[in-house]
Amino acid sequence: MLNEGKVLPVDISSEMKKCYIDYAMSVIVSRALPDVRDGLKPVHRRILYSMHELGLTPEKGYRKCARIVGDVLGKYHPHGDSSVYGALVRLAQDFNLRYTVVDGHGNFGSVDGDSAAAMRYTEAKMNKIALEMVRDIGKNTVDFIPNFDGEEKEPVVLPSRFPNLLVNGSAGIAVGMATNIPPHNLGEVIDGITMLIDNPEATILELMAQIKGPDFPTAGIIMGKSGIRAAYETGRGKITVRAKSEIEVEDNGKQKIIITEIPYQVNKARLVESIADLVKDKRIVGISDLRDESDRDGMRIVIEIKKDANSNIILNQLYKHTRLQDTFGINMLALVDNRPEVLNLKQILQHYIKFQEQVIRRRTEFDLEKASARAHILEGLKIALDHIDEVISLIRGSKTAQEAKLGLMDKFGLSEKQAQAILDLKLQRLTGLEREKIEDEYNELMKTIAELKSILADENKILAIIRDELNEIKAKYGDERKTAIERAENDIDIEDLIQEENVVITLTHAGYIKRINADTYTSQKRGGRGIQAMTTKEDDFVENIFITSTHNNILFFTNKGRMYKLKAYQIPEAGRAAKGTNVVNLLQLDPNEKIQAVISIKEFDEESFLVMCTKKGIIKKTVVGMYKNIRKSGLIAINLNDDDELVSVRITKGDDDIIIVTNKGLAIRFNEVDVRPLGRNALGVKGITLKEDDFVVGMEVPNQESDVLVVSENGFGKRTHVGEYKCQHRGGKGLITYKVSDKTGKLVGVRMVEDGDELMLINNLGIAIRINVSDISTTSRNAMGVTLMRNNGDEKVLALAKINKDDSEQLEDSEEVSEVHDAEENNSEE
């Protein structure tokens, strides 16, 4: 009072700090963050309590929203009417709340971002589940405080008989902090609470067996559980939510992508607009039409696809470039005793259980107090009825009611309340039937009092009541999960946008590489002339050719024993007759380094092995997983002697047989058990003993049903059943597999084949031919074979690859390998 009316100098820095802290705490505690107990912010709590006070229960009629907003403003929330109405609208939107607590009548907005109609037009009342939020509020279950002007009382928190914080979630931005809690399935959350009540030591992982993850009102698909687990364990995490889609195929073969569910809080109209913009800007091609066919029966966005486009590729592009796939950042921040805390899943459930214990205890105490008060009155009535004549005489002899009351209290030892109840007793209660009712009521009350006292004395009974009442709510309001949870995928990258299909990859002697669709080459009869596979320079020719899938890892092994990796789709696609791209633009090769072997694999595992064979007959086996981390600059796959180079690479299972074939027609078969696994940089061991001037042209891994097919440089070939090659010990000289002559020329390659397979041959002029293996007769090891490809003049067969066109599944899972030696070097060694 001494400083009233005076101007006091203060330090502006200190005053700003104080005022800002006061403002920040006001926003945090009184506006932006939900209470962990009822999951509500103050404005939502005041709206529900005001509607409860107005009697807007589900069985009653709707009331104008302007009336509700006015009541909230006038009694509890002296802020802007638009903010209160906006909060009321959100409580009624079934695309915002998993379980709406307000039943809105009129235009309350839409998932397209349409605003609600003005509050003077809309009406509302409480939803049935909202009654569970305020149930027992009149039984002193929660504390009340004065409102802003001290003329009313408002609850500090609602009893919230279901865990609203998790069930409906919450979002808000305070000062220096924000909360974003996703909604969940009511039944799952109640099951989680039940588990925690029964087993307080339950881990978060065990709780996740009941609470699978967020359950959004707009459904959608959550991709993976890692983000969910992180959020549940730490209170923070990020999940990926994807739209639900399906591809419809019409009778004419035309395809449509149908979107029926979108990620939570995504504006549908803006989503459709963003797709249209991508098509307009030609960032996505292949979409012929786009329309929104959503109606009162549900959401339906139709994306029509052009006939020559792939629906799956377009869908993945849409996931990448639009909010058909969105992220939801979880930050489970809530007020605990008016202090903001980041809570994990178990802590939220524990706080709710603790709060419900208080609610049940206070309700029980209220019921006990009320029952005890009634029992006290009944005890007085019983005394009066037992002495009815004396009571009547005393009352009749009293001059005033007060005198009668005091007389009853004095004569029968009654309390003031008991005496007043006797005076208020109607004469009809003096009948025998009424006296019996009073006796029965008293006996029932004594049982109730005993039960209430036993509840207060036993915490387990309180927990049992919480569990039973929650299960009743689950049975009444529970529903099926809307949001599906699917296996996690890696972040969408270019691979998701590439159609998986079989392709032919060719690599020339000069290092030109390209990718071509496998169906470009049509099958021809044995001995045909072939078609032009590619255009090569006069001094260049195709050296490597193999079949693979666009999504496979392509491992390139060089003559120096180094290896590199590319995805098949990273190899540029070109026309059949095009030259291709020089491999030095894709791989960091040394000047004297050239690709000598190529292998295609889907993934790097620890159960499979890479078996490598060199020109000098050295063999090495290494676990595939050891080559997982391949640098862009490559790494050493095998150490070589100065006069040796790498020839072949195959994938094995650890107990396969191996066949090595030489240029002069010799072959050896042995089991890879004879070759112990070695490290990446090891040299290897002897696989075959070579004659002078002989060298290895290929290595294969046979099975019992396959045939060994060898091809000579002059276009001759032969099939021999693998059974004719008996197993020997590693390091032997081998057996004759092909009698080479000037007519046939020496061998250039070997493949394991079966009926149904196809063979592709290519010569040094780039001419290719595709042959059915069944057209090649099976002969003995010593036979000369048949003509597979007619060559003119100096033409020489250089490369071969096996193709299994009819079995696409096998192609996708296969690990096809193709390799060819430097033809000029091979010829010089002959």
From Swiss-Prot:
PROSITE patterns assigned to the protein according to its UniProt record, in alphabetical order: TOPO_IIA (PS52040)
Subunit structure: Heterotetramer, composed of two GyrA and two GyrB chains. In the heterotetramer, GyrA contains the active site tyrosine that forms a transient covalent intermediate with DNA, while GyrB binds cofactors and catalyzes ATP hydrolysis.
Protein name according to UniProt: DNA gyrase subunit A
Domain (Topo IIA-type catalytic): residue spans on this chain: 33-497
Locations listed in the record: Cytoplasm
This enzyme's EC code(s): 5.6.2.2
InterPro entries membership: GyrA, GyrA/parC_rep, Gyrase/topoIV_suA_C, Topo_IIA-like_dom_sf, Topo_IIA_A/C_ab, Topo_IIA_A_a_sf, Topo_IIA_dom_A, Type_II_DNA_Topoisomerases
GO molecular function: ATP binding; DNA binding; DNA negative supercoiling activity
Cited function: A type II topoisomerase that negatively supercoils closed circular double-stranded (ds) DNA in an ATP-dependent manner to modulate DNA topology and maintain chromosomes in an underwound state. Negative supercoiling favors strand separation, and DNA replication, transcription, recombination and repair, all of which involve strand separation. Also able to catalyze the interconversion of other topological isomers of dsDNA rings, including catenanes and knotted rings. Type II topoisomerases break and join 2 DNA strands simultaneously in an ATP-dependent manner.
